[in-house]
């Protein structure tokens, strides 16, 4: 790492956070779930494509992720046709949740299972499955927290008009969301419209490493077409409008009767300057605006961040006055999926180049942080504290649900099940301590969900990383589940046990 890097000269804020964490760690044995606010929700999550399986059963048709994986683009050639096979094992999984003591289960509805062609006829078998899953959860006292769209766009809509790139997506998505409200809203009280709309446009339409594989040189190669300088912004705009449209329908027709809440879930990487240089500090601020502000600014203020307006220019879609009115305040809570910090340096020298994409527009270059250190995520729990502090100060302290937080390891040796994952318990405890401290300091966070309940297909790594509190034996036809030690640790905490002291960790 270069001289002057953050690892050598931490900011005063980080020093304070680290000292507070050290003090908290000394008293970690006193922290229980009852130290969190009354009504605080603890859970775990998955998504349909990642664990459901039954890809071609009971009327389900392909999503863009089915097409992508079957064309061999997923790491290791992984496909999710069976995955954890929750479609056939949901009762077993609900029993695992119940035994663990979860308050809630976050899952998604597969659009191509419920409405296989993306619009029109509802699949009765899909309707039956989700009704059964929801009823099973409620029977066991577990809240269903449901995501309406989690990346699995019906391939039929992609083929017909280009999917999210077309404004026609907004109408079809809204109709699909209303089917969900109408059929499940009497029991589902927590809705998420869209999962991570601030990353899907980058993976699918800038770098082209995810479906539908659209990009342009030099930002991506081997794509089926696309324009990395414009399409990510168009896709994000359509996702934002679709979200607002669904919320509008819910509030007009269903919320008062059904008594639920609705929000959106953003990927919450935290960007930190790589050095103490003024330019790097400015780069980190810009990147957080491009990453979180891309959606939070319209949701709170009705328009994209000024820094994006000035740097992206005419390539950033306009928000009309009527759309601004619909978007502003279109949430009852904000979901955040947080895993790590990313250190950035300024690369503003490239900003005037003719070929530009999202990262060139932001004027940053990533230089460490995010991702895996050897086998596991680097441990930077202070980054979650910074994210929550940022949401509190900049966006009016909205209600927040931590919808994903967790750590992964590599697959077990074939034929051997490894129950010992203390690294995961240590990771989760470190973040829970920071979360508790943030709440004490005024953060309006109301829930925390571990990613994930089960091992499953991961969008970035196939089956190369395992996030599950519960292991799934993918070599067994029955997809046998095994409870890992982290599940027992979480269960002990959820049932009133004290957080055990964790191994000392370095905050930077």
Curated annotation (Swiss-Prot):
Its EC number is 3.2.1.21. This is Beta-glucosidase 32. It is an enzyme of class 3 (hydrolase). The active site is at 196 (proton donor), 404 (nucleophile). One of its GO terms (molecular function) is beta-glucosidase activity. Residues 1-30 form the signal peptide. It catalyses: Hydrolysis of terminal, non-reducing beta-D-glucosyl residues with release of beta-D-glucose. The keyword Hydrolase applies. Keywords: Disulfide bond, Glycoprotein, Glycosidase, Hydrolase, Signal. A beta-D-glucoside binds at residues 50, 150, 195-196, 339, 404, 451, 458-459, 467. Disulfide bonds join 215-223. InterPro entries: Glyco_hydro_1 (IPR001360), Glyco_hydro_1_N_CS (IPR033132), Glycoside_hydrolase_SF (IPR017853). Glycans are attached at residues 222, 441. Belongs to the glycosyl hydrolase 1 family. GO terms for biological process: carbohydrate metabolic process. Pfam families: Glyco_hydro_1. It comes from Oryza sativa subsp. japonica (Rice).
């Amino acid at each position: 790492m270069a001289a002057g890097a953050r690892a050598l000269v931490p900011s005063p804020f980080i020093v304070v956070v680290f000292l507070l964490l050290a003090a908290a760690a000394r008293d970690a044995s006193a922290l229980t779930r009852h130290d969190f606010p009354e009504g605080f929700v603890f859970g775990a999550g998955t998504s349909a494509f990642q664990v459901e399986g039954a890809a071609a059963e009971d009327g389900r048709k392909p999503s863009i992720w089915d097409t992508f994986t079957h064309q061999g683009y997923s790491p290791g050639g992984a496909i999710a046709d069976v995955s954890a096979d929750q479609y056939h094992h949901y009762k077993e999984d609900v029993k695992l949740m119940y035994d663990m003591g979860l308050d809630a289960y976050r899952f998604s509805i597969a659009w191509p299972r419920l409405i296989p062609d993306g619009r029109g006829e509802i699949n009765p078998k899909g309707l039956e499955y989700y009704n059964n899953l929801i009823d099973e959860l409620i029977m066991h006292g577990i809240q269903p927290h449901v995501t309406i769209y989690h990346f699995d766009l019906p391939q039929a809509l992609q083929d017909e008009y280009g999917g999210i790139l077309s404004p026609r997506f907004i109408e079809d998505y809204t109709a699909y969301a209303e089917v969900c409200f109408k059929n499940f809203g009497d029991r589902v009280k927590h809705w998420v419209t869209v999962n991570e709309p601030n990353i899907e446009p980058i993976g699918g339409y800038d770098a082209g490493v995810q479906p539908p594989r659209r990009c342009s040189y030099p930002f991506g190669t081997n794509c089926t077409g696309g324009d990395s300088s414009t399409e990510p912004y168009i896709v994000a705009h359509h996702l934002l409008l679709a979200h607002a449209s669904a919320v509008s329908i819910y509030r007009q027709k269903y919320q008062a009767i059904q008594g639920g809440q609705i929000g959106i879930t953003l990927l919450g990487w935290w960007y930190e300057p790589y050095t103490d240089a003024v330019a790097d500090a400015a780069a980190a601020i810009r990147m957080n605006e491009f990453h979180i502000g891309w959606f939070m600014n319209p949701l709170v203020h009705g328009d994209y961040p000024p820094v994006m307006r000035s740097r992206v220019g005419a390539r950033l879609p306009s928000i009309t006055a009527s759309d601004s009115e619909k978007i502003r305040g279109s949430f009852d809570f904000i979901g955040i999926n947080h895993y790590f910090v990313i250190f950035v340096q300024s690369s503003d020298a490239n900003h005037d180049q003719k070929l530009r994409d999202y990262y060139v527009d932001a004027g940053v270059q990533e230089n460490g942080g995010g991702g895996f250190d050897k086998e596991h995520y680097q441990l930077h729990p202070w980054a979650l504290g910074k994210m929550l502090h940022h949401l509190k100060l900049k966006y009016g302290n909205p209600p927040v649900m931590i919808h994903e937080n967790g750590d992964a390891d590599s697959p077990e040796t074939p034929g051997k099940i490894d129950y010992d994952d203390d690294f995961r318990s240590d990771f989760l405890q470190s973040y829970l301590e920071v979360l508790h401290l943030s709440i004490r300091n005024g953060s309006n966070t109301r829930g925390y969900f571990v990613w994930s309940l089960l091992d499953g297909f991961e969008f970035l790594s196939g089956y190369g990383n395992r996030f599950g509190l519960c292991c799934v034996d993918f070599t067994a036809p029955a997809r046998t589940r095994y409870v890992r030690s982290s599940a027992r640790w979480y269960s002990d905490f959820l049932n009133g046990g004290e957080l055990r002291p964790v191994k000392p960790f370095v905050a930077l």
